[in-house]
C-alpha cells in the first residue's frame, strides 16, 4: 500500500512539472483542437470559391484529324497526321485518370508522355488545381494563332541577334514590321521592344531582368550568372525526316554544342537557360538576391521590419520565403498540368510548323503570307519551324506553359514579401561580348524587374520554339492566382496577422 502511494505521489509531481514547463497560450489539447479548426476553416474558405467552368477552343471537335491538338509521341502518318485511334485512346486515358490507362496509350517511339497523371494530384494548400480557370487558347485557324506563330518564326530567325542591337539591326526591323501589320498580335511591335512582355516593368531598361544578371549569394559562395551558351546558328528539326521522327517520339539524332560561358546577350542564350533550369531556380535566386539587400526592401506589412526585439527567420524570413517560393511553383505546375492535359491539349509550335509544311489550308492567311515564313522557306527549303532544342518541345501540351505558370506563382510570392517600389541598387547590363557587367543609369524597381523576370522565363521558351506568347501570358496569370491562394492560406496561419501587399500583373494592388 505504501509503495503504491509513493509511486502515485511521484507521478503527481512529474505531472505538475510537465504542466509547469509548457509555456504556451494554449494547452496541448486546445492547440490540437485549434489546429484542426484552422485546417477545416481554410478548407471551407477554398471550397466556397466555386470551381471555374473549363472550356477549350473547340478545335478537337471541329478541326479534322485532330490537327489542332497535341499528339507528340503518338504514331503518325508520313505527312504528320496523327493516328486517330491512338489519339482517341489518349483521350480515354485522360478521362480514366489512371496509371494503367496511360500505360496503354500507343507509342510511336521510346520517348514518354510527360507525367499526365500529375493533373490528378490533390493540393493541401491554396485551392485545388482543378478550381482555377483559363480562357480558351487561340483556335488553330484564328488570326491570333497566326500572329503568335509569325512571332515564333521571327524569334527562330533572330535567335543570335544581341538584344542591344535591336534598334540598328535591319532584320529585327523587318520582323517588327511583319508583326505590326497583323490584326490580332498582342505583343510590342517596335524594334526596341520586340519580343518583350506586356506587364509593368517589362519594357523598361535592358531586355533581361536584373535578377538574371546580379550575383547570387548562395550560402557561403557568391555565384555569378554567366552561363554556357548554345552554339550560334545551330537549329534542329529542319528536315521533314528529322521532324517526323521527333513527332513520333524517337530520340533526337543530334545534340547541342555549348560555347564559353557569358552573361545573356541573345534570345538563344535565354532559351538555353530555360532548357536546363530546375523548376523554381530563377525565383529562388531572386529571393536570395533580395534577402541580401536587407530589411529595407521587405514589404511594409512585415511586422519584423520595424521590430526591435524579434527577428524574422522561420516565419516571414528567409526560411519561409524560400519555402513558399518552391511550394507555389509546384502548385502552379499542377494547375497547369490539369489545363494542359484535361482541358486544352493545344498543339505545340513545331506541330503547327508541320501543318505549315503539309496542310497550310488549315491555317490563317496572315500566317501563310508572312514574310518570315518566306525567309524560313528560303533558308531551309521547307516551312518547318527551326527549333532551338534537338528534341523539340516537351511531351506535354502547349497551353499554358509550365515555366510561365511557375513564373506567375513564384513572382507573386516574391512581390508579396518584398517592397515592389524599392529601386534596384546599382543596375547593370552585360558588356558587348558578355564577359562582364557594366553599370547603367536606368531607374528600375523590384516589382518591375520581378515582372520582367517572369516574362523572361516565359518568353525564353518561345525563343526555343516550344511555346507561343499566349501560353506564357495566360500561364503567368494562372500562376498568379495559384500564388495568391497559397498566400491567403499562409496569412491565416500566422499569429502576427501580416498584411502584405502586392501589385498584380494587371496593375491592381491587393492586400493578402
Predicted regions and their residues:
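Gram-negative bacterial Sec-dependent N-terminal signal peptides
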Residues: 1-20
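Hydrophobic alpha-helical bundle signature of multipass membrane enzymes
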Residues: 21-469, 473-512
